[in-house]
Amino acid sequence: MKNPYFPTALGLYFNYLVHGMGVILMSLNMASLETLWQTNAAGVSIVISSLGIGRLSVLLFAGLLSDRFGRRPFIMLGMCCYMAFFFGILHTNNIIIAYVFGFLAGMANSFLDAGTYPSLMEAFPRSPGTANILIKAFVSSGQFLLPLIISLLVWAELWFGWSFMIAAGIMFINALFLYRCTFPPHPGRRLPVIKKTTSSTEHRCSITDLASYSLYGYISMATFYLVSQWLAQYGQFVAGMSYTMSIKLLSIYTVGSLLCVFITAPLIRNTVRPTTLLMLYTFISFIALFTVCLHPTFYVVIIFAFVIGFTSAGGVVQIGLTLMAERFPYAKGKATGIYYSAGSIATFTIPLITAHLSQRSIADIMWFDTAIAAIGFLLALFIGLRSRKKTRHHSLKENVAPGG
């Protein structure tokens, strides 16, 4: 039987194609925005940082409320905030007002996350990991398409703002589509009697689980965020690549992340435990980073770009969220809020640390990321072993129950 929520899921995924564009729109149009806002690159960078602050400010709050009031209102609110950002950022010459619109875009990201991830897990309860990993494919697709769109606008000598307008147009059409779609029921609509049939400890997330998954949310985000920001500079100034070649490393990185999504999704759905992939991908990320730090040569860096895109940016963050959400079966929005709040903190702290390290050597930045990946692997190992222990314990209880 066809899943009735497939059209809804498709609309939710298209939101993240636009989100993928939104994340890099200002950085790719930096020169034009400098002129528009009468500022310099540092001023535009300050506005870009507002996205992270806006995201963190409401993420946990939005997740909790989505469990109570439903997913649709927050998804629609996120789409409206994003459209306001796309239009507003182009119609101001004041950097302070631009910062406010950037903050609004960060809030939009939080509202979408709080409603989308739980909706997909509730729409596809038998394959929540696959459903969430596909989000990454659409984000990467948006980030792959936007440079092509901007290149076309430059070639045709058209207004740079059309890149914002195209993103806003896709979001508007998708909002009309999703408004007519049916969303799966969320736990807040279910009768409390259902909870009485289940042991209170069976679905309770311990402090240890909460801490380990939250820390993994920070570590996994930090690992790929650092690479995405410094890969080109590492290729140019450490490996000795030309500027044009170092920029292409990001395209190789994106191809790796997309390929991982399409390989990982069927694996999780059919054969492999999510915890196994969590441990495997984190371990490979550590080995790749360690290798490129020891041998920063032309070809090693090219191979590294693909491998690190595959293992760190190809859905491992979403796998971690899916595993955490299993500990919160009646509060998936809360789980999403906690997990991505930890990840958002990484987007603040990592740039501060790397800014200091870059004054000494860009090579030190990758060594720092290697240390982060090592901690991430130990953490993934702990999560995996703990998850298997709980699964084994649950199986023993089920086997004993009939005889008791």
What are these regions (language model features)?
Residues 26-27, 206-251, 258:
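Extracytoplasmic gate region of multi-pass secondary transporters
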Residues 57-94:
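Conserved MFS/SLC helix-loop-helix module at the cytosolic interface between two early adjacent transmembrane helices
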Residues 58-70, 260-273, 358:
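Helix-to-loop junctions at the C-terminal end of transmembrane segments
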Residues 101-137:
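Cytoplasmic helix-loop-helix junction between adjacent transmembrane helices
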Residues 111-124, 314-328:
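Intracellular juxtamembrane helix-capping segments at the cytosolic ends
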Residues 127, 131-186:
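Helix-loop-helix hairpin linking two adjacent transmembrane segments in secondary transporters
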Residues 274-319:
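C-terminal transmembrane helical hairpin of 12-TM major facilitator-type secondary transporters
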Residues 325-361, 369:
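A late C-terminal transmembrane helix in Major Facilitator Superfamily
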